[in-house]
Amino acid sequence: MDGRETDIGSRLRRLREARGISLSALARSAGIGKATLSGLELGTRNPTLETLYAVAGALGVPLTTLVLEPGASPAEAVHVPGAAVTATLLEVFEEPTATFELLRMRVRPGIVQHSPPHAPGVTEHLTVYAGVLRAGPADAPLVAAPGEHISWQADVPHVYSTVGPDEALATLLIRSPRQN
């Protein structure tokens, strides 16, 4: 394991403790095992995109809160792999009412990536550059070809997969309203 896992684990533990949430309660809320969450906090488990989004959603924070120190440049972020998607954080934009995270996505064919609900009010905006993507709410995904854009409320379970045998490339803009 490199320092990235330890850094993510430390930030995760600080956030959980600051909110007064037990390890068991957060694991239950995120839909992951207590041992998995404990391993993340200790920096002994390699976090996947699915797990990080599940925990971030349960805590009501953007993904960047877990993967970047406050004030750090997105250039310091690394690729975060998931079942089908590898995401790279390109930029974070802060406004008084929301945080915007811009990610580059590579989606491998033949696999469906399931993403847990984000915090209430989170929206995702995806633009496809190569390949064809099926993404959006798990019960009604949308399809986009190169040059097309799709958006959806991401506070419900959602999915990402390719249509056809080719890898897809896209950018994803996630808008997370500030939690009061």
Predicted features and spans:
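A short, N-terminal "cap"/entry segment at the start of jelly-roll beta-barrel domains
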Residues: 49-99
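Ligand-binding loop in jelly-roll beta-barrel domains
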Residues: 85, 154-180
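Recognition helix of helix-turn-helix/homeodomain-like DNA-binding domains
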Residues: 32-45
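Short basic helix-loop element that most often maps to the first helix and adjoining turn
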Residues: 10-27
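A short glycine-rich, His/Asp/Glu-containing loop-to-beta-strand
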Residues: 80-117, 123, 172-178
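Glycine- and acidic-residue-biased ligand/ion/polar-headgroup-sensing regions
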Residues: 121-137
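Short acidic-glycine-tyrosine-enriched beta hairpin
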Residues: 138-155
